[in-house]
């Protein structure tokens, strides 16, 4: 499938783009937004979920240089809960993302869980959207671009790779390393 013209669900975290975010929403869509943003007049039939990102972050002892990143993890918990993603699935996903770094995985999950628990106690679901786990399909491969590129490189004969480890290509190379380890 290709890019669709309008979105069913949007997460708005940026004042500069919030109008465009709303413009891309379909009627009947859902807007999650950081409640410190000033929303423009909304003329669509959409469901709006404010997220108290800044207020919740004040309850967390986090390094200042990590605040923006952790705010994103916070909304993962809020949106995940409202969309019906089980908490253990979020935990497993974070553990996988930060495999080999258990302290980082735990600190990220603690922030996700804060958002999850907030939504569980404070947000009444009003929309029709849910994310469900699909049954396992043993005849198909489901992957992302980095993993697909890594596998293609390896099966294509890659024998040597050099890169600077903070470039955007790092994820692709780390995927290749994971495949040969």
Model-derived segments and their meaning:
Residues 1-156, 160-162:
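Active-site cofactor/cluster-binding pocket
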Residues 149, 153-176, 180-181:
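Extended, hydrophobic alpha-helical segments in both membrane/secreted and soluble proteins
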């Amino acid at each position: 499938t290709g890019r669709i013209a309008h979105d069913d669900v949007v997460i708005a975290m940026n004042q500069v783009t919030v109008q465009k975010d709303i413009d891309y929403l379909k009627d009947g869509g859902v807007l999650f937004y950081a409640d410190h943003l000033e929303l423009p007049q909304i003329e669509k039939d959409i469901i709006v979920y404010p997220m108290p990102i800044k207020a919740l972050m004040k309850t967390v002892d986090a390094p200042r240089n990590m605040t923006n990143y952790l705010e994103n993890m916070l909304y993962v918990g809020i949106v995940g809960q409202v969309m019906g993603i089980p908490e253990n699935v979020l935990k497993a996903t974070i553990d996988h993302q930060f495999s080999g770094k258990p302290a980082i995985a735990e600190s990220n999950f603690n922030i996700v869980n804060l958002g999850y628990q907030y939504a569980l106690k404070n947000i009444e679901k009003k929309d029709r959207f849910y994310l469900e786990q699909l049954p396992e399909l043993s005849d198909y491969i489901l992957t992302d671009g980095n993993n697909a590129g890594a596998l293609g490189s390896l099966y294509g004969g890659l024998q040597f790779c050099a890169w600077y480890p903070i470039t955007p290509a790092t994820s692709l190379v780390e995927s290749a390393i994971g495949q040969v380890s």
